[in-house]
Curated annotation (Swiss-Prot):
Main location group: cytoplasm
GO cellular component, one term: centrosome
Organism: Mus musculus (Mouse)
Known tissue expression: Broadly expressed.
Position of the Glycyl lysine isopeptide (Lys-Gly) (interchain with G-Cter in SUMO2) cross-link: 1002
InterPro entries (UniProt xref): FBF1, FBF1_C
Biased composition (Basic and acidic residues): 46-56, 247-258, 287-299
Keywords of the record: Cell junction, Cilium biogenesis/degradation, Coiled coil, Cytoplasm, Cytoskeleton, Isopeptide bond, Phosphoprotein, Ubl conjugation
List of residues that carry Phosphoserine: 172
Annotated segments matching region Disordered: 17-168, 180-225, 241-566, 1091-1124
Protein name: Fas-binding factor 1
Length: 1173
């Protein structure tokens, strides 16, 4: 947790970051960091709340106890209010600081007799800032230039002066409230609420700011502010130089070295842990900028009126003493004295009649713009000079240093970056009623000086900044020449004008001790930083007003002298407890103050001596502080490192445990995932196998159904074809029968007519031959012929009608048959298309089956190769195992033989040993018997026997020992043999297990080979089935092609028959035409015959004429040949010839008609459709 706290402190954009990280720490960490950082409670949002004071007091008991030893009660109570604006971070152990302050208190008691005579005034002043200070906090990055100004020294400021002003502004309190907010935005606000902000601004300027960068309260030389955060002075802090007691170039080198750039984020932790230097932090600009402070116009006017007489008294100064141009400061100094400091007050417009002088004085308050720390900003942007808001401007560190360090400065710099909190509270608490109106009246003068100064400062900003750099060396030289009483008088004179909020009391503390005030004195006066007013009060007036025996009298005289023309007269003693808790009597004893009245030379000497004495004591204090700070820093680092080590150890253990748990979780998850994958893949394989079986079954059933459907369709088609053929054959047979019957009837009629015609011909011949005698018979013949022709016509019409009716009936029947045949043909076409589609599908299926068969065959080959390889591997492994087994058997047999031999040898040895033992026992028994017998004989012999027995005993013991050794060796060897036997048994068991594993592997391989064989058989079966299906498809295709060829052959036959019928019809038609021509010729002959026979009666000519008219047209083509023939041939022969021709033509026509009818029957559409089908 300590490492976390340190990281958060490093990332903190402001010191208050440590407060947020502190809230989550435990008790032990709080104790450790309480030692490191002091009380780390956050500064309250509203400083007036007493809870924050109680918390601060409770969190730092040692701090409070150490203060109580040497701080007055009133001062301690007054400091409680100022704690609200105190720093949240300190650079040193507060105990060390307080111990150092005790020594300073004793020294100040010796120097200044009446040091604590007016300490009760600090009570009201200390309580002011927390109660009436504005409560609006600025964020971490929004501090104005006024707050940044005191942390930015110029490039080469005087060593002592820069340190005096800078060391106490090490910390920029970004978390504190803006004391100017709410005071400057509203011009109509009451002056009682405006004065606290103006008086609280200069507080950080005094050395009290070293204890905390917030506004502090006026303190006596022994007072030390009670802060929320303890001070931790770094080893690099030059305390003596900061307090104004050191003029060594070392401080300047430190400060200029620290100005090289902004500090990194690491410096935050350095500040919190006391490892940084105050000078480094002073070179860093604040993270925010305060706005320019401008007073109301009524206050500016009042301040301007006061400064008119003061300006007249400043004309005696030399022009070389003016830092920025020809401007003369508003506060008077002794004649002939040169001031090295800028007589800069942001409210200098109150002391001069012309606005130009006011702007110059206003511009002199911002030399920090020339500091190289912030080259990014323009000349005085960081000071807020170009802002139009009403906040105060920030004084540069050089100006603060000059105000607190130079004894010759007649005009004091207004530290406007932080409010002088104590003064606004002094008026209500300890100021008399007569002193309050002047304090309120000081505000118009401040407003007036700033109303005219911002514009002029913007116009002459560049010249002013360049002039600041040029005046630095002259300021360093002039600083040594200015030590003397005029500074004291000027400071004392300016103290009466401090209610306007422009004169820091730190300068009074510097000027009173001959240019450099002691550290306690400057700390006590840190919070009492009233602004410089515009009244030009002379040094003589200052000496008559302030150096009085009684602080009350001095305050009264000061207020009385300046009340008439100074509306912002400040009462510096107990009457103004918040504004001047450290009066002039705190700096000098009353006797010394009285001795200062006659002349300024004696005051110079006295103040110089006091400054030297305090500078020497301050150096010793600084060394002590540095050593103690370093010690506390080292202890803090050791505690921090121990905490970090413990925390890292705990973190490492937790990380190891977490890592182990993560590893276990990962392994468990991996195992579970592997199991899930195995089960999922097994399920998927099973599912695919089932799907394959289902698909194969579906395919087989689909093939069977397709075959059945095809067989049904083929059978149905064949049945339909057979039925159509039968119907066609029946129809053709019926038509043939009808035609034959009609032909028979027509033949009969024709024969009958031929017979009649023959009879008529015979009769006509007889009549012609006997024309003369048979005229009547001829007429009868003619009538018969006419009757015959009429009957023939009726017969022909009847035949034609019958032909029409039969043809219509036949056409209807034929149309129906054609429709049926067309439907059958369409069905046949659909069936053919279906057969084509089925054939294509079968071809596709056959192709797929071939591809699958090839793939399966390829896989089968691969599987066969793999199985063969596995078989070879298994066989080789089996052979090697067999060889190993043989070798092991041989080894085991050899070892068994060796074991048997060893056993036999051991048994033999045991037997020999037992035999030897038995022999020895027997020998011993014999010896004992001999011994007893010999013992009885004589003593000598007994002795010899005894010796012999002893010798035998020793031998026996030796033999027994050797036997025991041999037996032990045998037992060891037996144990070894037993161990070897157990090892052999274990190896045999391992071999058995390996054999079982091999057997299992062999079984598995056998099962795999069986599965592969079964799969190969299935594949072969599938290939056979596919080939069978392919052959069946091919057969079906061939049958379909054969049927198509048969249908095409039938169509060709029908087409040939149609062609033949068409030819027959043409012939019949030609025959009919020839018969018609013959009839016409016969009619013509009939007409010509009566013309050649004059004896014919006229009634015979009527029918003859009609017949002639009927046949006249066809016979007109050959009239010439008929006439000569009639003329040459006898008429009866010609008549017979004509009759024969006529009958021949009729017969020919009849035959042609019959032939045409047959051809039309053959050319009927149903016959064509049937044959084409």
């Amino acid at each position: 947790m300590t490492g976390q706290c340190c990281e958060e402190l490093q990332r903190a954009p402001k010191p208050r970051m440590a407060l947020r990280t502190k809230k989550g720490l435990k008790g032990s960490i709080e104790d450790v960091l309480g030692d490191l950082l002091g009380d780390d409670t956050t500064p309250p949002e509203k400083p007036a709340e007493p809870a924050s004071h109680a918390k601060d007091t409770a969190s730092s008991p040692q701090w409070q106890a150490s203060k109580a030893k040497f701080l007055p009660k009133d001062s301690v109570e007054g400091l409680a209010g100022a704690d609200a604006e105190a720093s949240s971070v300190s650079d040193a152990d507060p105990q060390v600081f307080l111990q150092n302050m005790k020594d300073l208190d004793s020294m100040d008691d010796d120097l200044f007799g009446r040091m604590k005579s007016h300490q009760p005034s600090g009570k009201g002043a200390a309580k002011g800032p927390g109660k009436e200070g504005p409560s609006n906090h600025k964020p971490a990055g929004t501090l104005t230039a006024n707050e940044k100004g005191y942390t930015m020294p110029t490039k080469k400021p005087p060593p002592s002066s820069s340190k005096t002003g800078l060391q106490y502004k090490k910390f920029s309190f970004e978390d504190f409230e803006d004391p100017l907010a709410g005071l400057l935005s509203d011009e109509e606000e009451e002056t009682a609420t405006k004065l606290p902000a103006v008086e609280r601004k200069p507080a950080p300027k005094s050395p009290g700011a070293a204890a905390g960068q917030g506004p502090s309260v006026p303190l006596t030389p022994g007072d030390t502010p009670i802060r929320k955060k303890e001070l931790l002075f770094d080893e690099g802090d030059d305390i003596m130089t900061t307090l104004g007691f050191e003029d060594s170039p070392k401080a300047e080198r430190k400060k200029t070295g620290d100005q090289e750039g902004p500090l990194p984020a690491r410096s935050k932790l350095d500040e919190l842990l006391g490892r940084g230097t105050a000078a480094k932090l002073l070179t860093r600009p604040g993270t925010g900028e305060r706005r320019e402070f401008q007073l109301d116009k009524k206050y500016q006017k009042m301040g301007g009126e006061e400064s008119v007489p003061a300006r007249d008294k400043e004309d005696s100064w030399d022009d070389e003493t003016l830092t920025f141009g020809a401007y003369k400061p508003t506060v008077a100094s002794s004649e002939g004295r040169q001031s090295r400091r800028q007589s800069v007050s942001r409210f200098l417009g109150e002391g001069g009649p012309d606005p130009k002088g006011e702007s110059l004085g206003f511009k002199q308050s911002s030399p920090p713009a020339s500091s190289p720390i912030h080259p990014r900003k323009g000349g005085a942007d960081w000071l807020g000079l170009k802002d139009n808001d009403l906040d105060l401007l920030s004084p540069s560190p050089v100006q603060k240093a000059q105000q607190e360090d130079s004894p010759m400065t007649p005009s004091l710099l207004p530290p406007t970056n932080q409010p002088s909190a104590p003064e606004p509270q002094s008026a209500p608490t300890g100021l008399p009623s007569a002193a309050k109106p002047p304090a309120k009246g000081a505000r118009p003068s401040l407003k007036a000086s700033q109303a005219s100064s911002p514009k002029a400062s913007e116009e002459k900003e560049d010249d002013w900044l360049s002039h600041v750099i040029s005046q630095k060396k002259s300021q360093n030289l002039a600083r040594e020449e200015r030590a003397g009483p005029p500074k004291d008088l000027a400071s004392l004179g300016s103290l009466g004008q401090t209610p306007s909020g422009s004169l820091p009391v730190a300068q009074v503390l510097e000027q009173a001790p001959a240019g450099e005030a002691s550290k306690p004195t400057t700390q006590g006066m840190a919070a009492v930083r009233p602004g410089v007013t515009g009244s030009s009060m002379s040094w003589s007036q200052a000496t008559t007003v302030l150096p009085v025996d009684d602080p009350k009298k001095g305050a009264a005289s000061a207020s009385g002298d300046f009340s008439s023309r100074e509306p912002a007269v400040y009462i510096p003693h107990s009457q103004e407890p918040t504004g001047l808790s450290v009066p002039i009597q705190t700096l000098l004893p009353e006797s010394m103050m009285q001795s200062l009245l006659p002349g300024s030379g004696y005051q110079k000497q006295l103040l110089a001596a006091q400054g030297q004495l305090q500078s020497s004591t301050a150096q010793l204090q600084v060394e002590l502080l540095q050593s103690q700070t370093k010690l506390s820093e080292l202890e803090a680092q050791v505690r921090k490192l121990e905490l970090e080590r413990a925390q890292h150890r705990m973190l490492l253990e937790s990380l190891q445990q977490r890592h182990q748990a993560d590893l276990e979780l990962i392994e468990d998850a991996h195992r579970s995932r592997i199991k899930v994958l195995e089960t999922s893949y097994q399920q998927r394989e099973e599912q695919l196998r089932r799907e394959k079986e289902v698909l194969s079954a579906q395919h087989a059933s689909y093939c069977r159904e397709a075959e059945q459907a095809r067989a049904e369709l083929v059978a149905q088609h064949q049945r339909q074809m057979a039925m159509a053929e039968q119907e066609r054959d029946q129809e053709v047979a019926r038509l043939r029968e009808l035609q034959q019957a009609s032909i028979l009837e027509m033949r009969k009629d024709h024969e009958h007519q031929l017979q009649r015609l023959k009879m008529l011909k015979d009769q006509e011949i007889d009549a012609v031959t006997s024309a003369t005698s048979h005229t009547r018979s001829l007429n009868g013949i003619i009538e018969q012929m006419e009757k015959f022709s009429s009957s023939l016509n009726t017969l022909s019409s009847r035949v034609e009608a019958s032909h029409l009716t039969t043809s219509q009936q036949r056409e209807l029947g034929i149309r129906q048959q054609d429709e049926q045949l067309r439907a059958l043909q369409e069905r046949l076409g659909r069936q053919q298309r279906d057969m084509e589609e089925e054939r294509n599908r079968l071809q596709e299926v056959i192709g797929k089956m071939e591809v699958r068969l090839s793939e399966q065959s390829r896989l089968l080959e691969q599987e066969r190769w793999r199985v063969a390889a596995e078989k070879t591997k298994a066989e080789s492994a089996q052979r090697t195992l067999e060889e190993q087994r043989k070798i092991m058997v041989q080894q085991i047999a050899m070892e068994r033989e060796e074991l048997e031999r060893a056993k036999s040898a051991l048994l033999e040895e045991q037997k020999s040993v037992m035999n030897k033992c038995g022999e020895e026992r027997r020998r011993l028994a014999a010896e004992w018997a001999e011994y007893f017998t010999q013992q009885k004989l004589s003593k000598e012999r007994a002795e010899r026997e005894a010796e012999r027995a002893m010798h035998a005993d020793s031998q026996r013991e030796g033999t027994i020992i050797s036997l025991t050794k041999e037996q032990a060796e045998l037992t060891v060897r037996a144990c070894e043999l037993r161990a070897k036997e157990e090892k052999l048994l274990a190896e045999r068991e391992a071999l058995e297990r390996e054999r079982q594993e091999l057997r299992l592997e062999k079984d598995r391989l056998h099962k795999a080979s069986l599965r592969l064989q079964a799969r190969a058989q299935e594949v072969e079966h599938m290939s056979k089935v596919a080939s069978k299906k392919y052959e069946e498809g091919e057969q079906a295709l061939q049958e379909a092609q054969q049927m198509q060829n048969e249908q095409q052959g039938r169509l060709q036959v029908v087409q040939r028959q149609q062609e033949w019928l068409r030819q027959q019809e043409q012939r019949v038609h030609q025959e009919h035409l020839s018969l018609a021509q013959q009839r016409l010729q016969l009619d013509r002959v009939r007409q010509e015959v009566p013309a050649s026979l004059p004896g014919l009666p006229p009634r015979v000519q009527g029918p003859a004429a009609s017949s002639r008219d009927a046949v006249q047209a066809p016979a007109s083509s050959s009239p010439q040949c008929s006439q000569p023939a009639a003329a040459q041939v006898p008429t009866h022969l010609l008549a017979k010839l004509l009759l024969l021709k006529h009958t021949a033509e009729e017969d020919h026509d009849f035959l042609e008609n019959e032939q045409f009818f047959l051809e039309t029957l053959k050319k009927a559409p149903y016959n064509m459709a049937y044959h084409s089908a």
